[in-house]
């Protein structure tokens, strides 16, 4: 799994700057073997499309223009 993340991150790093102006804040799912990627408004949207395009494959998920997909908070 870490190898999948590293390969997906390498693909994402190559295309991130070209996506920033139009897609900042959106979610991107990167399939590391093919280099294919899906951009959407949330994880569910990109997961459904990713499963349709590449059944059985794993993806790296990133939020375009940020270093994290989610920020966990403790409100209690």
Give the location of each predicted region.
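A short, exposed loop/beta-hairpin motif centered on an aromatic-Gly-Thr core
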Residues: 35-40
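Short aromatic-glycine-(Arg/Gly/Cys) micro-motifs in beta-strand/loop hairpins
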Residues: 12-32
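Residues immediately flanking
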Residues: 32, 43, 64
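Anionic, Ser/Thr-rich low-complexity intrinsically disordered regions
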Residues: 8-10, 16-18, 59, 71-76
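Short, compositionally biased leader-like segments
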Residues: 1-8
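C-terminal structural segments of small proteins and small subunits
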Residues: 55-71
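A short, charged, amphipathic alpha-helix used as a generic interaction element across diverse proteins
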Residues: 42-57
């Amino acid at each position: 799994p870490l190898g999948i993340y590293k390969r997906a991150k390498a693909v994402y790093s190559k295309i991130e700057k070209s996506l920033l102006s139009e897609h900042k804040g959106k979610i991107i799912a990167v399939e590391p073997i093919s280099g294919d990627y899906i951009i959407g408004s949330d994880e569910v949207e990109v997961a459904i499309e990713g499963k349709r395009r590449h059944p059985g494959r794993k993806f790296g998920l990133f939020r375009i223009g940020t270093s994290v997909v989610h920020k966990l908070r403790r409100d209690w």
